[in-house]
Amino acid sequence: MTNIIFDTNAARDFVAGVGLGELEQYAENIASRFNSKGLKLSVSPVVIQELLYHLVDSNDKDFSVSFKAIKAMMLVQEYQRKDGVHAMMSPSELLIANEIYHMRSESRELMYSQLMTIAMVLSHGDINHIPDLHTIDGGTVKTYVDDIESGFATQIREVCQSVEFMSKITGKSFEEELNTEATEISIVTYFSRTTYNLLMNEGKLPDYHLFQPPFLSDDDERLRKYMWFTDLMMKGNKEIIRRYPAFLKLFKEVIRRIHKSNNQISGERLKNYVWDISLMFHVNDHTVNHEPFRFITTDKAMLLASGAFRNSNNVMNYGEFHEWLMQNDEL
């Protein structure tokens, strides 16, 4: 089977022109067509989270289409699986926790599980009865997403400015400096630190704040712990770079665009990139669970420019995908 992954905008395009009362039949028809072509819809909680963001306020301009996108995707998956089980693709934090630290973040697993449960409830409900949209920490989905997006926009600008500064110091071109190991480690730290903090808050990893510099002359134990921490982070970051090249390439492409715009690219535009980059963790070794995939997007040009996809057949604009899906021939 070939996995089909929608990014958030493609998920909205997926239900464009479909009425609320037509969603169930539409989803059943799409599931049948997917099956006939050997396709399997894979739903990311990252996309569900972005769509739920627009359901917090019924006056949101994307309220209706986001509801329809969630309902249609969940129903397609349900019709395809026929076992009542909704598969959840692991977001970046869970992948890093499991594959790099060999641990589980139960708190984050629970949060994503709750989001997928809400999506499942929505798939059998109606648009006038939206369930409570709070995350595990008590904040709304909107608050959580806003915080992540704002932090990312600030962080990626800082990385870009650091690359620009270092290129002046070293005499290297911007592109050469962007591709140094030091820059790649800086980029990856954005994700690895998030996961470390999650595991730290669950008591599974030590609180690094307790052994940060400066050190006194008799601080041998704190120094030893600090060296252990930095070694753990360095090894983990290098392993993330090795295992997940697609996310790193897209991250770099966004940095290039900031640089080329003279840092004039808007904050609103930057914020949305964090979710696109997060989705790239799903395409580890250019498969999904060792099965082929097609990534359906509204920004194919950028993904191809980044080099995240070695095979251009693995990424399609939604229009291309829809046109092919409605044909009877093979891909």
Please give the residue ranges for each predicted region.
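Short, hydrophobic beta-strand segments that form beta-sheet elements in well-ordered domains
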Residues: 293-297
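Active-site-proximal, substrate-binding regions of enzyme catalytic domains
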Residues: 2, 8-291, 301-331
